[in-house]
């Protein structure tokens, strides 16, 4: 077993808490940080604190923003009557990379998962229903991960929203359990084009 000096071990431990970062990558990142000049480390620390203190949730769609409303919600060129429902901001970013979707989003903040004690009340589903019921919405597109949790959440939302508007779900050319953020832009664009009606 490798023994690190205490400050280095602590730094590696922090990096290991990041999603998708294993011990080797954490070690590589920590060693890279130690090679940087103090000014770079100060700038990095400042950027971390600034992002942590100033980035919150859009009051309308719950995307990340430093304003009351995110850039997408404020953009008058986007179709405000077309809402794409995603689990996390990372999924929104994946769809934006595909450059196919011209509407707005609603980030629910996870998926219904009874095994993990995540019920609909812990997600931004009630706010979505309120948003749809108070506006003239042409279509809701559900772009949730193709998994048991994603299917459960889609069916639950579809049932709640179908009295108000058309609800569709994007088509998938990927295996069950795949994360949207790892899907290439062409596949995502085709998935949006080939969406099917849920209600």
Swiss-Prot record:
GO BP annotations listed: DNA recombination; DNA repair
ZnF locations on chain (C4-type): 58-73
InterPro entries: DNA_Rcmb_RecR, Rcmb_RecR, Rcmb_RecR_Znf, TOPRIM_dom, TOPRIM_RecR
Keywords: DNA damage, DNA recombination, DNA repair, Metal-binding, Zinc, Zinc-finger
Signal peptide boundaries: none
A molecular function (GO) term: DNA binding
SUPFAM superfamilies: Recombination protein RecR
Domain annotation Toprim: ranges: 81-175
HAMAP family cross-referenced by the UniProt entry: RecR
Function, as annotated: May play a role in DNA repair. It seems to be involved in an RecBC-independent recombinational process of DNA repair. It may act with RecF and RecO.
Annotated protein name in UniProt: Recombination protein RecR
Organism the protein comes from: Prochlorococcus marinus (strain AS9601)
Gene that encodes the chain: recR
């Amino acid at each position: 077993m490798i023994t690190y000096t205490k400050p280095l071990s602590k730094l590696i431990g922090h990096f290991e808490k990041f999603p998708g970062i294993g011990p080797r990558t954490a070690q590589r990142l920590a060693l890279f940080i130690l090679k940087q000049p103090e000014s770079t480390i100060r700038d990095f620390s400042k950027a971390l604190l600034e992002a942590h203190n100033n980035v919150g949730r859009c009051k309308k769609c719950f995307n990340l923003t430093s304003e009351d409303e995110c850039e997408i919600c404020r953009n008058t060129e986007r179709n405000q009557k077309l809402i794409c429902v995603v689990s996390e901001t990372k999924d929104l970013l994946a769809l934006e990379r595909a450059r196919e979707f011209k509407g707005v989003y609603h980030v629910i903040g996870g998926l219904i998962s009874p095994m993990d004690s995540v019920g609909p009340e812990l997600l931004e589903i009630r706010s979505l229903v309120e948003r749809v019921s108070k506006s003239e919405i042409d279509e809701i597109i559900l772009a949730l991960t193709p998994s048991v949790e994603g299917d459960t959440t889609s069916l639950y939302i579809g049932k709640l929203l179908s009295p108000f508007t058309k609800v569709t779900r994007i088509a998938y050319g990927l295996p069950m359990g795949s994360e949207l953020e790892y899907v290439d832009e062409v596949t995502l664009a085709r998935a949006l084009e080939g969406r099917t009606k849920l209600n």
